[in-house]
Amino acid sequence: MEEHPRAWIISVGNELLIGRTINTNAAWLGSRLTLLGFEVERVVTVPDRVEDIAEEVGRALGRARVVITTGGLGPTYDDVTLQGVAMALGRGLKLHPGALEMVRRFYSKRGLGLTEDRVKMAMLPDGAEPLENPVGAAPGAVVEARGSLVASLPGVPSEMEAMFEKALRPLLEEIAPPGAVVECGIAVVGVPESSLAPYIKEASRVSPRVYVKSHPQGSEIGKPLVRVRVLARASTLEEARAEALKALEKVRRGVEELGGSISEEDSC
Amino acid sequence: MEEHPRAWIISVGNELLIGRTINTNAAWLGSRLTLLGFEVERVVTVPDRVEDIAEEVGRALGRARVVITTGGLGPTYDDVTLQGVAMALGRGLKLHPGALEMVRRFYSKRGLGLTEDRVKMAMLPDGAEPLENPVGAAPGAVVEARGSLVASLPGVPSEMEAMFEKALRPLLEEIAPPGAVVECGIAVVGVPESSLAPYIKEASRVSPRVYVKSHPQGSEIGKPLVRVRVLARASTLEEARAEALKALEKVRRGVEELGGSISEEDSC
């Protein structure tokens, strides 16, 4: 597959590591970033520890065009994501007047004042700008450094999604590569994945801009169900669709030759 | 929290990065590893590329006592996890007679023979031993190197879970630390997370063996719902329970003082 600007997602939170929470945020972001034309290269989940966050953000800097962190922006003692980002950037945290105004407004509308724990949410890495939180109290933050756009979003899914759509998407669209991405696929029944393997390989060679992947979901033998997904990138939507269909055609031929059938189609 | 042997989970698969599949395997494994007494330090999702897999397995070696990879063991062209593990170990892949016998048996029971793509599933890193797959065709692999136990499990959840329980758990129990881990919590209504923050901090100071975390799930203001979870480790189950309850007691007191109430309890 051609080189596309890379994106890293860094998910912060012990609850993810101990399996209390399933990381749906990473999948949601991965899908949006892919359709915007970025190549998601890593999702890294780290504990709520400054050094661990700094280590992974530091690895991503200069390597990924976009680095998105989720979680750890709230008012409690272990919300330390922006400390970790600041450490990776070699900068300090600074009270941002615009962010403080966002926090102040959020609480004053509800008849509450500022407390130490609430003011903490307006401490951003030096040089970062706040991202408005349309749903909750904690602003996000975005900063450009060493060729990477580093954006920090909340961990609560409704807040993360709203901030991504309203505040971050416009910034990403400016740096997203031109062109189009499509993803589609078929579900194949009656053929073991291992028998389909040579056809999938052939399909993947249709173009370097096409990525073909099989997902076995039934049993390998007995009642095999294999979903074959194709992701194609091209300069126009029509071209991307055409390449995806060309690749799927190779798989269809295999299904036919092997006596299987197609139970579902998901058009490009 | 006290130092416990660390575990890393390395999830292999483009479908996870592009958000087509939600990484439920990592949560499932994270929960089991935590209850076995390991501290899950990273979950890293990587593409189906040998170099990327090798990079992350290489980082984990010597740092994590246990490294578990999921996915990429199947018969298709992009199932390259064991190549990545071998590269990280500085070893080659080798046809393992025991693994080949597992694959041969799986297919012959179903009246099928071996093909090149099927034999590929028995190519393990030099020195690794196969892990039986009670559900599917591809064996797993386990190898001890540089102080780390590296285990590779399939990506299909039913296969991953069965292999973990039957083949890997006994090996992990041998190296797991003695002692017990409990996790429990309460759901608090009527108090914003930012007001509860000082009490949560106080609870987290009850013992270095206790970890307290709040998860806001309602809105910060209006109808706040905050789940507070406590994870406690100790040498016996009774001690772990006692420490968890002591920490929760601090939070309960805060809820009372702030005029909130507890809507759910999940006993230790």
Curated annotation (Swiss-Prot), chains A, B:
CDD domains in the cross-refs: cinA
SUPFAM superfamilies xrefs: Molybdenum cofactor biosynthesis proteins
Domain of life of the source: Archaea
Record Pfam families: MoCF_biosynth
InterPro entries: CinA, CinA_Arc, MoaB/Mog-like_dom_sf, MoaB/Mog_dom
Family designation: Belongs to the CinA family.
Protein name (record): Protein APE_1980.1
Top-level taxonomy: Archaea, Thermoproteota, Thermoprotei, Desulfurococcales, Desulfurococcaceae
